[in-house]
């Protein structure tokens, strides 16, 4: 929760996620076990290679915020006037960081390669995904999974289905 709240207080718009990137890097380095790369000026890709045969699975979270003013009295509201995490990317990033922490602890029990993609600039066309693709991030990936927070479900419940869900591109 502390990670999510810090991220919520420090939102950054697409292609300007410098503090967010530094925050992610600091935690990934502390967890250990990841090969970390920066294929673009913001965003992070962390690879966990178990050295055992298996598939390459990618997990992706978006890290950018929106140019919207947050108008509430939450103790962790945005500290940047006119910019906020209105779409849940602070939660997505915190969830992927939590996943990274857990994976680093159980890596000996895993097989294959796991790629954690902290994608910059999801909200602003042409989007950071294109830069990552052109940099070769998706080469060798067998499957990729993402998530999106939704107020349509009560806390503790998640929705899942085969195929594409909530994808705009």
Regions found by a protein language model. Name each.
Residues 45, 66-68, 73-84, 91, ...:
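Histidine/acidic-residue-rich, glycine-tolerant segments that coordinate divalent metal ions
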